[in-house]
Amino acid sequence: MKYSVDQVNWPEEWPEKPEVTVEVSNDHEALRLQYHVKGEQLRAVTTEDQGPVWEDSCVEFFCQVPGERGYMNFECNCIGAMVGSWRLSRAEEVQPFTADEMGRIERKCTYPREAFEEKDGLYEWTVALRIPLDLIFRGKAPVFPQKLRCNFYKCADKTKRPHFLSWQKIDLPQPNFHCPEFFGEIELG
């Protein structure tokens, strides 16, 4: 399935709207996400996993397994540096993924994993992620078809033109992607 990440949730303060889609598939072993982005400005300062990738040109996937109280966040900048964790909320009971768990997430990006300051111009880029399902389902084997509650995001907090896009609308006064109450639902066949 292909989804458009096109909700500009805070248009008065952050009207920027790059073109963003994400294609989602699974092979019963892993979830595959292929983000396609076209927009102005490109930034990739963070090169290490579990660093502030959201400040760069970044795509994100937050998901919640049915019946779970918490959710997971996967955030990846345009050069493949990632943040990943399980959590109850933005700041509550955060359990960052270990280096081994992060290493199991396959990443393919348009740009090599080399830092660069913000560049002006029009850029098209992709990030492809392959996330093992046993990581998402915390060691349990999912039964297919399987539903996931989730949202897809695009952000770039520290660029000249910050933006905060989502697939599902977020009805909050300030940018915050850590809000499972606004997740939509996808089905893994």
Give the positions of each predicted feature.
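Structural preference for beta-rich elements and adjacent junctions enriched in aromatics
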Residues: 1-189
